[in-house]
Amino acid sequence: MDIRYSAHPNDFARYTTEEIRKEFLITDLYQPDTVKATYSHVDRMLVMGIMPVNEVVPMDKDIDVWHNFGTSFILERREAGVFNLGGKGFITVDGTRYDMGYGDCLYITMGHKDVQFGSCDPENPAKFYLTSAPAHKAYKTTFLSFENAQKRPLGDEKNANKRVINQFIHPDVLPTCQLLMGLTQLAPGSVWNTMPSHTHERRMEVYTYFEIPEDNVVMHFMGKPQETRNVVMHNFDAVISPSWSIHSGCGTSNYTFIWAMCGENMAFDDMDSFSPSDMK
């Protein structure tokens, strides 16, 4: 499992391109019959990519759970959210099966021990994107279809940011301890996300970008608002955003991304926004 430590913004300002990518970028998430796990010390967020092809893959495959989590199983003191970004698949949670189509989401509450991932067609395998945060209480494991997500249209064509925010793991949808997740789709011709930029000092965030057409990229902006840096993102890459950092993006085409947050609270208005004219 890859371990990422927290960084001070003053140190970050001196990082090279490669140092920024090494500390914050997560690549190669989907490898056949493998669990790609990244543990961030920023609010203890866990990011996983799981692509079952020829076998059903347990969540803890090739992970020393006691060494990495200090528990007997991963979700003993954690909750998780999972999206399927590939072909049809399924997740079994302590024997209960959930069929997962493209864009579907599953919230898995704290306390489940046996979590396994499978694909219905090895020629078109599921790609499961998972985030997990510490939890203190068990709620209800809940399947959330893409069609039934709570949708919030935002932006417009004039500002090249017309998009739909699909809220899945959200206080208006279901209770969780601290994990929040959703999926934002940009319309054709729109390329900007999260502009004007903001920070939320009491929550960290992870983005994963996908549906990026071949030979296109997304420029993800991070850092303090007056001292920004960019990370070039390719299809299915993820990036860690500390609480002090903005997290905005601009693509060479439209794209889709999943956002995941955890931290002190779930108050979406607990943030500081910045005018583009004030940024550097």
Feature-to-residue mapping (PLM):
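Acidic, low-complexity central loop/insert segments
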Residues: 86, 90-125, 129-134
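Non-cleavable N-terminal signal-anchor transmembrane helices
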Residues: 1-45
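Double-stranded beta-helix
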Residues: 122-163, 258-280
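Short, glycine-/Ser/Thr-/acidic-enriched flexible segments
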Residues: 52-53, 88, 214, 246, ...
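Acidic/His-leaning functional-site neighborhoods
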Residues: 39, 175-238, 242-246, 251-254
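Conserved metal-binding segment of the jelly-roll/cupin
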Residues: 100-120, 232-253, 260-262
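A short beta-strand-loop-beta hairpin characteristic of the jelly-roll/cupin
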Residues: 74-101, 210-235
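A short glycine-rich, His/Asp/Glu-containing loop-to-beta-strand
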Residues: 26-68, 162-205
